[in-house]
Amino acid sequence: MNPIGGTELQVKLLEKYVDSKLLNNFQITTSVPEKIPLAKDKINILWQQNSYDQPNLAPWFKDKDNHKKYDWYVFNSHWCYEKFRMVYKVPTERCTVIKNAIDNFPERKIHKKGDPIRMIFHPTPWRGLNIILGAMQLIKNENITLDVFSSTKIYGNEFMDNNDDTYKPLYAQAAELKNVNYRGWHSNDYICKHITDYQIFPYSNNWEETSCISAIEALGAGLHMITTNYGALFETCSEWPVYVQYDTNYKNMSECFAYAIDSVIDYLHHDRCQEHLQMQQDFYKKFYSWSKRSLEWTNFLEGVLNAKS
């Protein structure tokens, strides 16, 4: 299986929603500079989805002579751009921000008082699976359960073979907890199809995201989200989630997440909360849909092409 993470999903959507004739004028490389040789007959763009501190790209950016190799740099969040600007002094006149987006906005389900509260955790395991499992050990309300789809398989079989053993103790812990169901890897299509079966996305993130497709999908489906203010999450998620302060003490974070999750049962069914979730979904339909993002990409690419001619 080839990698099908957030970056690969965004590339597929770009190719789906932006005119292929326009795209053919460009070579767009994602995240890791020069993993594809620079094209001599096209405009070279580096579409940056990774964090500034990743070891597979940091050495390249530290050498300022490399910066001239790409005609443009596209960043997936203002947070991501700011980090590269501050750390590597990237050429700001050749940088722009175009955020990630989705095209799945299912009909939102209304939660009623007394209904079971089902939660979903579908990011990779190093993005806080240990913290949410710690929280679930503290939650005693039998009406609250968590389905875990976390896996390294999302980045392909080779990546899984090299890295999955590290997280098998967490998978085993998830399988043993009474209020947790370990589901393992499922395709993004499956997640999007079934995401409204859940009411909450508790994203106990302790990995600096530059954006977050899982968050956008959950918020765009009208799920209530509890997350940290780490990395770019406060930008991607805006004012819609309940935020748990990021803490280097993961035991404290687990306790805070447990408290936040336990509190949900008191308000999730309230009209005011349901109105909030409807406004949230409307917000993501308006600002994070590919119908909007395709216009941003088209305008940007046409502008670059016109300036080149």
Regions found by a protein language model. Give the residues of each.
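A charged, aromatic-enriched C-terminal amphipathic alpha-helix characteristic of glycosyltransferases
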Residues: 5-9, 248-251, 255, 269-306
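N-terminal pre-catalytic "stem/leader" segment of glycosyltransferase-like enzymes
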Residues: 1-38
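Nucleotide-activated donor-binding/catalytic signature segment of Leloir-type glycosyltransferases, i.e.
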Residues: 160-186
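Conserved donor-binding/catalytic core segment of Leloir-type glycosyltransferases
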Residues: 111-128, 133-136, 146-147
